[in-house]
């Protein structure tokens, strides 16, 4: 439920109505950045309905969604999120590419140059790696962040990397332009609050078995903590199907674009687990309304330290970028 106050209210009158709402056992949630004086109300719908005819109230909007700050109900325009010089959202369609794991300085320099040459807009790479097996490569940590940052700086690409532990936040903040919260940490609420307390953009990936409402509530944690620079990412969910690594839920993109003002990316690499499926699913993501892609690219996928099977070669990535630009032009989207 939302309450919209009359525009001519003075601060004293506004404080008075807010106090009345609180006395009715309604939590009043501020919604900054709107053209109107609007607040989300959490609590009894019956109690909220009593304020529909209040002299200070212009409108009561009935919406029972549990997420408030990320909802589109009072925020009809798409939010724009800046990752360094790169703007995500609106009519632009962006592509962020890079290896699953940061391996060597030479690897990162090579792939950054190739992503730049193909027209990619950002560089991704994992310095801290959540792996299913404790014996798998776990990432280089701070050394990996330095390799990633150096490559991005040299080729003018803003960089994105995953955060797994709040104690690593100072290191990441010093080297990246955006944080990524992976599927396994989507409901790590202490981590969500930690990234919400700083001003770096956050790419929040959907959990393996998370509903879309749970994804939006996870985003709400970040925004409620003070950081409204949130980008959602559909990266596939776990189903009964075993032909692909996950099932890429493109329904989710259209649904999210209808329910939230936050930008939505798609990760077809994790969504399918198969490099040959990445190009068609990337084009489908563009067609269905996504704001961009996260794609794994490796100079030699057969030698990748992790997730080589789902990584594109630089040549495949370049072809895909050309195809995406052609499709974007047809459907009225813009690729920077």
Predicted regions, residues:
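N-terminal small/glycine-rich loop or linker at the start of catalytic domains
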Residues: 81-100, 127-134, 257-266
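N-terminal amphipathic alpha-helix/helix-capping segment at the start of soluble metabolic enzymes
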Residues: 65-96, 322, 329-336
